[in-house]
């Protein structure tokens, strides 16, 4: 499971279903605040990278256990504590096409979901938000 796992408008990643979240970080463009990459670490697994580009959703895993924050051009925000995600269980991660762009949904067994999506009407293009189901 090393490398790019998905590059499509739709995918369903079942490998992490039922596992608890250890960490969720985002790489942010400091110029516009847009989310570039979501880093998800689930129990017993390496870090998974999720991102959107040109209307397509991507999922990668490079068998890394730490987020490389050496790039000073970007900001790395840890949302684990801010959104109280540590220990919450993943029930599904999937990408779907919405308005000719992909979005990635992270469903949690605790009745919450995280959504990585594209919004062309804002100053920044890519957002992540936490919602109740």
Regions found by a protein language model. Give the residues of each.
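Surface-exposed, interaction-prone regions used to assemble/regulate multi-protein complexes
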Residues: 1-133
């Amino acid at each position: 499971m090393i490398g790019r796992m998905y590059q499509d408008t739709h995918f369903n990643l079942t490998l992490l279903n039922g596992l608890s979240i250890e960490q969720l970080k985002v790489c942010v463009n400091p110029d516009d605040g847009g989310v570039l990459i979501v880093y998800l670490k689930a129990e017993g697994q390496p870090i998974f990278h999720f991102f959107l580009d040109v209307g397509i959703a991507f999922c990668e895993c490079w068998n890394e256990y730490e987020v490389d924050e050496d790039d000073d051009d970007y900001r790395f925000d840890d949302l684990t504590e801010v959104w109280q995600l540590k220990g919450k269980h993943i029930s599904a991660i999937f990408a779907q096409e919405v308005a000719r762009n992909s979005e990635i949904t992270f469903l949690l067994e605790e009745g919450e979901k995280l959504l990585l999506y594209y919004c062309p009407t804002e100053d920044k293009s890519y957002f992540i938000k936490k919602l109740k189901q």
